[in-house]
Amino acid sequence: MALILFFIMLVWHRGTQLERQYCVPLHFADYVQPLGELHDDPEIPRLTHNLVYLDNSRDFESIDRDILYSILDKDAKRASAYWFISATVHDEPSVMRYEDETYGTDYIFRVRLHLGFKDHQRVNVYLRQIVSDLIESGELPPQNRKHSIYGKSDVGNFKFCILHKVVPPKAGLSSMDEMVLNVKYAIRHIAGSKAQWYGLDTSSLIVERVPLLVNQSGRSTRRIERMEHEKAYI
């Protein structure tokens, strides 16, 4: 049993190292304007009031490229507010604090939860409290949810978008690293999804699978040629 636990810990640690190695961090402030343009674009239907991503960034300056790609490029997701949530677990048993960064907007919120090791990481519960706090302080406009069995509310609905990394074919990894990542993702599947870990409402989930990396050197530089043929007219 001890050997199995050691193997799992080793695979998880090495897999996390590889994920960080191949993560492409972007300077978040450079994308505040594109997010604002999407937020204000009336031609794109609003997906939800609050679009939430779980973010592993260690600071508020950078963010994983895949998150911004999901919002701006992969079926542009317009929302009243964009939330990027990360959590830090402390050695103290009962810590419940949060810090946030808005980049001078009232629709972009980077939030870091500081939780004790005994506290459940119930992101949806904490986030609703934070949204209520920010609406009360005037930092977030009321979202005016009119239709609910609980009556009207200033807090709108939520969508949680979870990105699952996958290893694409011919990714350029060594056989050992590819095996480590595939084993880690198999363990993750057995242990439960992020939705279960963070207590998210599964009815409000968007799950997207993204390749861990793209082997640029494997792309062909040749162009396909258009053939000439006799035109057929009716």
Label the model's feature ranges.
Residues R20-I234:
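Cytosolic C-terminal regulatory domains/tails of membrane transporters and channels
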Residues V11-Q21:
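Transmembrane-helix exit/juxtamembrane "anchor" motif
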Residues A2-H13:
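Hydrophobic core segments of alpha-helical transmembrane domains in multi-pass membrane transport
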